A protein has these predicted regions:
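Non-catalytic substrate-recognition and accessory regions of acyl/acetyltransferase enzymes
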Residues: 1-98, 106-162
Length: 162
């Protein structure tokens, strides 16, 4: 297993992949959170020749607590550093216990499968998030392989139905 890959050896996130990830997150905002305006954006300019990391943020229009998401895709120093990862750096939803967290994780699993991201990591979760993570199947290390996460979500949703 490689400990750390050089920038030029790591798989690049090409411009079309960057755009499609952003569109998928934007669609999540529109269909799940009922946001009508463009609320998510790539925090750096899309790289024509690809990039090893992509940051997607959301912003709030108005005062008060709004839906807030900060995601990173690509090369990070967590787990196996030779594989593409998804990192949930910040997440907060105005409405809690509405299924938004589960829906976001399902969306991220779809992105992971489509673009060969191997694992999802949640950085510095608060107590509410830790409780949710435990229900979904996360352990103390705060990351799961995408395929395991997808299975865990299906099991979680199945348990909730009964």
């Amino acid at each position: 297993m490689l400990d750390l890959l050089e920038e030029n050896e790591f798989p690049k996130i090409q411009k079309d992949e960057q755009s499609e990830i952003l569109n998928t997150i934007q669609n999540f905002g529109e269909s799940i959170l009922k946001r009508s305006e463009e609320w998510a954006y790539i925090s750096s300019f899309p790289q024509e020749d690809g990039t090893t990391s992509l940051k997607i943020c959301s912003y709030s229009s108005g005062l008060g607590i709004e839906d807030d998401i900060y995601l990173r895709f690509g090369k990070y120093h967590i787990g196996d550093q030779s594989e593409k990862q998804i990192v949930v750096a910040r997440i907060s939803f105005k409405k809690r216990k509405s299924g938004y967290g589960t829906a976001l994780l399902k969306t991220l699993c779809e992105i992971g499968e489509r673009y060969n991201y191997v694992s999802l990591h949640i950085e510095e979760p608060n107590l509410d998030c830790k409780a949710f993570m435990k229900k979904i199947g996360f352990k103390e290390d705060k990351f799961l392989p995408i395929l395991k996460l997808k299975e865990s979500i299906e099991e979680y949703e199945s348990r909730k139905r009964f």
